[in-house]
A protein has these predicted regions:
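Gram-negative and organellar
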Residues: 22-298
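Bacterial N-terminal signal peptides
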Residues: 10-16
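Bacterial N-terminal signal peptides that target proteins for export
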Residues: 1-8
Length: 298
């Protein structure tokens, strides 16, 4: 299976409406809100659109991607709150069946209750797609005629205890993810699932920009439709030890390694024990946008 995408052109612009007061670059003040519009586009050549196997015929196509976004940001008692919407339209010039239109909605807030107590929360909704030959159709891209579509949600929150000047910081976290495929075939219904995760992270500063961390999480995966089949529900425990460091004011790196145990509810599936690790970087170029790049043992 082979696929290569060559990006030829990429463009990003910030838009503004003259009738509204431009408070600063990229922001438009509208009452109590700062509106932050943006637009990105790219052109790429894809030489295996459906991830066809080596002995199957392949589809070659140029692809244009257009993605407008609008973020509305404000403050509540000095705490930042924002809501955003992004649309992504992908057009394949030689394969109309693979065209897609995805929608993304997000709301988030960071609240400092006092010098030692902070809370943040985020909610996300995605009406998205999986390219043919990826996700559920991995290795079977030519067996289906259009990309698989799904709806997913994410709700998460963190509570942090510790002053900014203290050496120690305790973070309690919880989140919930759901995934529901649009298709009604049984093969898709049995993959609709909910993932609930709770955890705690203890950090202790060991340098001016370096912190040692102990990260413990428990994840519960539950599938919605399992009538007549063996259950695939599972519980997973992860214990990781590592460090985080601040490379710049806008960039934070992290590296963790440890132990993972995955216990399946089905009696015919044995419990998995093994090592686990996670490495990545978080980049926050502006206050309303954070990018996370990471890789792990999964």
């Amino acid at each position: 299976m082979f696929k290569r995408t060559k990006s030829i052109i990429a463009m990003s612009v910030i838009c503004a409406t003259p009738k509204l007061y431009a408070q600063e670059a990229g922001r438009i003040q509208a009452g109590q809100f700062d509106l932050i519009p943006s637009f990105t586009s790219s052109m790429a050549y894809v030489d295996n659109v459906a991830y066809a196997r080596d002995d199957d015929p392949k589809i070659y196509s140029w692809r244009a991607t257009l993605s407008p976004e609008l973020i509305a940001a404000t403050e509540v008692d000095g705490n930042p709150v924002q809501v955003g919407y992004r649309l992504e339209r992908g057009v394949y010039f030689s394969s109309d069946n693979d065209d897609y239109t995805d929608h993304f909605v997000e709301a988030s807030g960071d609240f400092e209750l006092n010098s030692r107590h902070r809370v943040n929360a985020v909610a996300q909704y995605e009406d998205g797609h999986e390219e043919r030959g990826t996700g559920f159709s991995l290795g079977l891209g030519t067996a289906i005629t259009t990309p698989d579509r799904y709806k997913s949600t994410y709700f998460g929150g963190e509570y942090m205890y510790g002053a900014a000047t203290s050496d120690g910081l305790l973070t309690l976290k919880a989140n919930r993810e759901t995934l529901d495929y649009d298709r009604s075939e049984q093969a898709y219904l049995i993959r609709d699932r909910v993932k609930n995760k709770v955890g705690a992270e203890l950090g202790y500063r060991i340098g001016s920009a370096t912190t040692a961390v102990l990260d413990v999480t428990q994840t519960y995966v539950r599938y919605d439709n399992q009538t007549g089949i063996e259950t695939r529900d599972s519980d997973e425990t992860r214990v990781l030890l590592g460090v985080t460091w601040e490379s710049t004011a806008a960039t934070t790196g992290f590296a963790k390694v440890g132990y993972k145990e995955k216990d399946f509810e089905s009696a015919t599936r044995s419990t998995f024990y093994g090592t686990d690790w996670e490495v990545g970087v978080e980049w926050q170029p502006v206050s309303y946008s954070t990018f996370r790049f990471s890789t792990n043992a999964d």
